Swiss-Prot record:
Bacteriocin active against the Gram-negative bacteria S.enteritidis, S.choleraesuis, S.typhimurium, S.gallinarum, E.coli O157:H7, Y.enterocolitica, C.freundii, K.pneumoniae, S.dysentriae, P.aeruginosa, P.mirabilis, M.morganii, C.jejuni and 20 other Campylobacter isolates, and the Gram-positive bacteria S.aureus, S.epidermidis and L.monocytogenes. Its main location: secreted. Belongs to the bacteriocin class IIB family. GO terms for cellular component: extracellular region. Stable between pH 5.0 and pH 8.7. Activity is lost at pH 3.0 and above pH 9.5. GO terms for biological process: defense response to bacterium; killing of cells of another organism. This is Enterocin E-760. It is found in: Secreted. Keywords: Antibiotic, Antimicrobial, Bacteriocin, Secreted. It comes from Enterococcus sp. Thermostable, retains activity after heating at 100 degrees Celsius for 5 minutes.
């Protein structure tokens, strides 16, 4: 499965509130996975935190 940051603002299209518009990743919501995707430790933490900071947002498979 592919994983993407899903937000209440509009699914993949609303991923801008998660830190990157249209972001598609191969990892669930874990910092190690984001580090593997090249975000770096700080980037992974920030991305995950932003993704979960909006009501109804989070990671979803697609």
């Amino acid at each position: 499965n592919r994983w993407y940051c899903n937000s209440a603002a509009g699914g993949v299209g609303g991923a801008a509130v998660c830190g990157l518009a249209g972001y598609v990743g191969e990892a669930k919501e874990n910092i190690a996975g984001e580090v593997r995707k090249g975000w770096g430790m700080a980037g992974g933490f920030t991305h995950n935190k932003a993704c979960k900071s909006f009501p109804g947002s989070g990671w979803a498979s697609g």
